[in-house]
Amino acid sequence: LDYIKWDMNRNITEMYGADLPADQQLEFSHRYILGVYDLYDRLTKAFPDVLFESCASGGGRFDLGMMYYAPQAWCSDDTDAIERIKIQDGTSYGYTPSMWGAHVSAVPNDQVGRLTSIDTRAKVAYFGAFGYELDVTELSDEEQATIKQQVAFYKQYRKLFQFGTFYRLETPDTSDNVYGWETVSPDKQTAIGMRYQILNGANPAYIRYYFKGLDPERHYTVNDGSEVFSGAELMNAGYFVPRVMNRLQSPKVPSDFHADMFIVKAVD
């Protein structure tokens, strides 16, 4: 075994320690966690090459104590891509993406019934320990081919997604129905930005995506395009995200729950 997902979706009711006097019964929960740490300590020492993943739902322990033994945790059993944007955005305030268990799940989502594209689901899950949470035997040939491409893409950029410098660029507090994330390599050679449009609207304003963390003196391409931009331009003037006004101009009007991805590469 190389990997163990440690889950425990079970309540502890009528908590009581037979070895504790009445005035120490409130210590039960604390002592229980010390026992979990002790078990983790013995297991990780006996099997140092096994990756343990803990769970936020199973025991509600997404904290630094558990991360010492299990450096990866399942953020939530809510796997809807749109819900997960909010969950992972909040998680990012305390933990790096390499710690987030983030999977593409089936649709309609089993908790909220929402339909989202497999493209958007993957673009949310890329920021984290990427995987799939679905029955592969029910996938269409097209979906199977898409998943192969997604896995290959993630393997190519896994270190950047998990260990790059992570930036929160936009939230619905600052932008209408939008979240924006970015990860930048330590050498500022490569960056990947993501813009999540939750609900679409008619006649959108011109959209510019403002990067962070690039080298202002270097020059970059976006999505292997022919145009070259300085890092200063991408961070201060932003990158123009084309949008159409209606289906008379293009049949590809983005729908609700759309995600744009920007792969930025230095050319000097």
Regions inferred by a protein language model and the residue ranges of each:
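Carbohydrate-binding surface patches
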Residues: 172-216, 261
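C-terminal beta-strand-rich structural cap/linker in extracellular carbohydrate-active enzymes
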Residues: 231-268
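Residue-level detector of short, conserved catalytic/binding motifs and their immediate flanks
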Residues: 50, 123, 191, 220, ...
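Active-site neighborhood of glycoside hydrolase catalytic domains
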Residues: 1-119, 129-138
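Catalytic cores of secreted or luminal carbohydrate-active enzymes
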Residues: 119-170
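Solvent-exposed beta-hairpin/edge-strand motifs
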Residues: 212-227
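Carbohydrate-binding/catalytic loop surfaces
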Residues: 20-28, 171-180
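Conserved, mostly hydrophobic/aromatic
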Residues: 7, 52, 125, 193, ...
